[in-house]
Swiss-Prot record:
Record key words, sorted: Cell cycle, Cell division, Coiled coil, Cytoplasm, Septation
Source organism of this protein record: Enterobacter sp. (strain 638)
CC per GO annotation: cytoplasm; membrane
Gene that this polypeptide is encoded by: zapB
Protein name as it appears in the record: Cell division protein ZapB
Function per UniProt: Non-essential, abundant cell division factor that is required for proper Z-ring formation. It is recruited early to the divisome by direct interaction with FtsZ, stimulating Z-ring assembly and thereby promoting cell division earlier in the cell cycle. Its recruitment to the Z-ring requires functional FtsA or ZipA.
Any coiled-coil regions, as ranges: 5-81
Domain of life the protein comes from: Bacteria
HAMAP family: ZapB
Coarse class of the protein's main subcellular location: cytoplasm
Subunit and partners: Homodimer. The ends of the coiled-coil dimer bind to each other, forming polymers. Interacts with FtsZ.
Record field: compositional bias (Basic and acidic residues): 49-59
UniProt cross-references to SUPFAM superfamilies, sorted A to Z: t-snare proteins
Cross-referenced NCBIfam families: PRK15422.1
Length: 81
């Protein structure tokens, strides 16, 4: 009977260790999910920022082209004079 009690206590200890390990792993999983969500939000923000910069860049290029056209027109008028 003492032998089976020892076996039972060892089994109980191993089960408790398994439960503790599972609990820790679940906590780790939740932490990693939160980090993953935060990173996904950062990626989304970065993509939005990039798109905004691309639009701004395109507008600036169009403005530059407009100014270059005006400058060429002015230079053409000066040559006529």
């Amino acid at each position: 009977m003492t032998m089976s009690l020892e076996v039972f206590e060892k089994l109980e200890s191993k089960v408790q260790q398994a439960i503790d390990t599972i609990t820790l792993l679940q906590m780790e999983i939740e932490e990693l999910k939160e980090k993953n969500n935060a990173l996904a939000q950062e990626v989304h923000s970065a993509q939005n920022g990039r798109e905004e910069l691309e639009r701004e860049n395109q507008q600036l290029r169009e403005q530059q082209n407009g100014w270059q056209d005006r400058l060429q027109a002015l230079l053409g008028r000066m040559e006529e004079v």
